[in-house]
Amino acid sequence: MAKLEICCFGAECALIAERSGADRIELCTSPSEGGVTPSYGILKQVIDLVRIPVHPIIRPRGGDFCYSQADFAAMKNDISMIRDMGFSGAVVGILNEEGHIDLPKMAILMELAGPLAITFHRAFDMCINPLLALDQLTQLGVARILTSGQQANAELGLPLLRTLNEKTQGPIIMAGAGVRLSNIQKFLDSGLQEIHSSAGKQAPSTMNYRKAGVTMSSDSEVDEFTHYCVDEDVVGAMKDIMSIYTTSVN
């Protein structure tokens, strides 16, 4: 049966995703940066409360995926902590200056990960040669690759997603970026066995008093009286479609 991974930005979202039928959670913070490593407090809360598999992201900052030695030191510490806390997997990705998989750094993280199932995230979509990268990640032993097919969204990337899914000899190819209730059927019809979605919405702040003219963001257009959260109805509806699809092909 196809699996649905939901990207969550905190414990509250993770609990909603679990309750709605998600098969697995990618745990991040800072959606405006595409997701960075959660704090220890969030990690502890989620590992204590959530029963389905949770894979935290190991990403020390926003921006590109070519990391300094200081960045890499933080990543090594984070993956060791996540392993020791008892998570079932983690999400990482490192490229070198030329846009290839940074094999030496990835090999070190894979060794530190121990039993963790490793997802190589959408750094894959920024690499120069996706088929070579697939071979390299297979040799490294990653469990899955999260990718949009090197396009702005996964629907546009369906041709490469199909090719990767046909060629893979190891990593599961998981479609992500712009996967929604309205287009999830296209990914299932393409034979993809894992789907990644934020399935989210903007929730209003509970604050009654709202100070005007002051912002904590460098982007003055950001509405700081909303926050991103998982939409329970959307997750449930996506799982319903996946269940119907599985029944129809069996």
From Swiss-Prot:
GO terms for molecular function: copper ion binding. GO terms for cellular component: cytoplasm. InterPro entries: CutC-like, CutC-like_dom_sf. It is found in: Cytoplasm. Keywords: Cytoplasm. Its main location: cytoplasm. It comes from the Bacteria. NCBIfam families: PRK11572.1. Belongs to the CutC family. This is PF03932 family protein CutC. The lineage of its organism: Bacteria, Pseudomonadati, Pseudomonadota, Gammaproteobacteria, Enterobacterales.
